[in-house]
Amino acid sequence: MGKIRKLDDQLSNLIAAGEVVERPASVVKELVENSIDANSTSIEIHLEEAGLSKIRIIDNGDGIAEEDCIVAFERHATSKIKDENDLFRIRTLGFRGEALPSIASVSELELITSTGDAPGTHLIIKGGDIIKQEKTASRKGTDITVQNLFFNTPARLKYMKTIHTELGNITDIVYRIAMSHPEVSLKLFHNEKKLLHTSGNGDVRQVLASIYSIQVAKKLVPIEAESLDFTIKGYVTLPEVTRASRNYMSTIVNGRYVRNFVLMKAIQQGYHTLLPVGRYPIGFLSIEMDPMLVDVNVHPAKLEVRFSKEQELLKLIEETLQAAFKKIQLIPDAGVTTKKKEKDESVQEQFQFEHAKPKEPSMPEIVLPTGMDEKQEEPLAVKQPAQLWQPPKQEWQPPQSLVREEQSWQPSTKPIMEEPIREEKSWNSNDEDFELEELEEEVQEIEEIEMNGNDLPPLYPIGQMHGTYIFAQNDKGLYMIDQHAAQERINYEYFRDKVGRVAQEVQELLVPYRIDLSLTEFLRVEEQLEELKKVGLFLEQFGHQSFIVRSHPTWFPKGQETEIIDEMMEQVVKLKKVDIKKLREEAAIMMSCKASIKANQYLTNDQIFALLEELRTTTNPYTCPHGRPILVHHSTYELEKMFKRVM
């Protein structure tokens, strides 16, 4: 007798459930997507104990006909496709016919559904076995309840996380579905407490405000572009609003939320040098394309996709974001934090756009620290970053009481999705309608971010603090400038241009610089000699495991030539495959940092003025190459509010 046997349907469904139904969030995703495919405009999601005890989905969709109810719970039974050609024209969220039988095989499931043209159907299934089927009175739509999930697979139940974690996974899925389908009204309840309600009016920004808060919605930049193959729309936050994780970026392809690393990477590249390392924007990007260009049949969970014109899509995303940011003045508002009776007022103040009445600009008097003679020094040579001005011996020192620890700048925002579960009072329809109307009004009142160019306005210096920060003003208010970050941006653009072409002029070294490497490092560098020439580094083999450098480009920072060479070599050794674009970028960033003014370095009037004027000529005068802000703005209105001149 043969050893190979065909598995029965119940066992097959249990095996399939291992891929399709990983946790309660998977059940919610599959059932809500089915409701959307059924043309629902309103969907309610009711949970008990994060879905482990009970999940109930109620929609007003097309419903299921009586003769289809049993078939719907058979493996690979679907109304979405008929033949193999339909696989390449998929517009629906579901199509595999695996979700319902998989869910039913590991739970106690109850279904009440009606198409509206005939009596409804009531179906009860336990562990894949049909317990009850009868006709019933029902409105049009579907009401499906899943209880005691994984009751017959204790091993799977054992690996469920805490209720808080599982609920967080569900809210994350529901949030992304709400973003991808703003035309559908979604209500999410946990233990009879409302967590989310979207109006279903089609306004994505209102959905984003419901999820992330109205303060974040005020900082959203609209994104829109079109090519022959792709149409992209969405919103991304200004660089000042960031999070510590990529989870706040949502990518939607033909109405389907997908997890795609290269799409997220393209969004990050669109913020090139605008974000600090380890910080990520909040973003929502909807991509429409011919279904022939995307394969959604990669994994049963349908979260992974593959594109046939991936590079063209990535380029379109990067260029669209970069073009949008070039139209905006990216100066973060410092904001005013004062205690308010309303709990959200203080947070709102930090994000609020303030519009002070413009006044006639005037050139202020320059106030400099004692002991500095501006006539003795030449203006700072920012175009040739080599010789930096040194403060005189009798330099001004701030009082010790004013010295404070350096802190890296972070936007003053409360993380929204890091604590996604907002327990509220028991649901009340009147309160809920009022909240939605109030939110809708607030979203409508949001003023669009001005996209009239990103030129830095003229700034008139006032003075310097701690030899680190420059104070300047104009008719819009007060500006605080980080002098190191400012010159770092200037130097970066200078070096980025230089390192992008082979040096015509080189400086011969009096004594050739020798670089000793391990055998593995030597072989790796040897493979990249031609690539290194493209960034101005010419190496000659010297002995068994060594190279020598006889010259370097004249634009290498003076006194730091060998250090620059060592760090460039380290980059080559560290990378398995040298990306010349990345190598140039890293080299330019490294040299710009080393050649820039440091903290506690006092400048003359002419040097400050030259630095600010040079900053205005850069393509991005708002962040240093590492993504840190160069300047922060206090509007005149905010200052008047601080001093209670306005209430």
From Swiss-Prot:
Biological process per Gene Ontology, one example term: mismatch repair
GO cellular component: mismatch repair complex
InterPro entries hit by this protein: DNA_mismatch_repair_CS, DNA_mismatch_repair_MutL, DNA_mismatch_S5_2-like, HATPase_C_sf, MutL/Mlh/PMS, MutL/Mlh/Pms-like, MutL_C, MutL_C_dimsub
One GO MF term attached to the UniProt entry: mismatched DNA binding
Pfam families hit by this protein: DNA_mis_repair (PF01119), HATPase_c_3 (PF13589), MutL_C (PF08676)
The protein's role, per its UniProt record: This protein is involved in the repair of mismatches in DNA. It is required for dam-dependent methyl-directed DNA mismatch repair. May act as a 'molecular matchmaker', a protein that promotes the formation of a stable complex between two or more DNA-binding proteins in an ATP-dependent manner without itself being part of a final effector complex.
Protein family: Belongs to the DNA mismatch repair MutL/HexB family.
Protein name: DNA mismatch repair protein MutL
Protein species of origin: Bacillus cereus (strain ZK / E33L)
Classification lineage: Bacteria, Bacillati, Bacillota, Bacilli, Bacillales
